[in-house]
Amino acid sequence: MSNIIKQIEQEQMKQNVPSFRPGDSVEVKVWVVEGSKKRLQAFEGVVIAIRNRGLHSAFTVRKISNGEGVERVFQTHSPVIDSITVKRRGAVRQAKLYYLRERTGKAARIKERLN
């Protein structure tokens, strides 16, 4: 039974997901339905957490919008996601960057990874 589930999950998974880590700045383009119209909406921010669980993988992106912190959790293999673009690589030493929630301005900056 578990082989059937694994096979179905494997078929559902996207193959073109770029590799990114916590601390990286990414732009996620998401399909949004408003009434009868369908359009792309971009959400750009810093990846603060990644959850690797196969088909159920997710990542959290945080940005500051009008002085207010906004976080959004995306399912990595969701059909709603059109594309994920890595804008900048960040050098951090933790897997979860929840400490950025308390920081603002220059204190919330992340060094750029050079390699």
Curated annotation (Swiss-Prot):
Recorded GO cellular component terms are:
cytosolic large ribosomal subunit
Where does the source fall among the domains of life? Bacteria
Keyword Heme annotated: no
Keywords assigned by UniProt?
A: Ribonucleoprotein, Ribosomal protein
Pfam families of this UniProt entry?
A: Ribosomal_L19
Q: Which GO terms describe its molecular function?
A: structural constituent of ribosome
Any Gene Ontology biological process: translation
Family annotation (PROSITE patterns): RIBOSOMAL_L19
* Annotated InterPro entries: Ribosomal_bL19, Ribosomal_bL19_CS, Ribosomal_bL19_sf, Translation_prot_SH3-like_sf
Q: Which family does the entry's similarity section mention?
A: Belongs to the bacterial ribosomal protein bL19 family.
* Function according to Swiss-Prot or TrEMBL: This protein is located at the 30S-50S ribosomal subunit interface and may play a role in the structure and function of the aminoacyl-tRNA binding site.
Q: What is this protein called?
A: Large ribosomal subunit protein bL19
What is the native source organism of this protein? Answer: Sodalis glossinidius (strain morsitans)
Gene for this chain: rplS
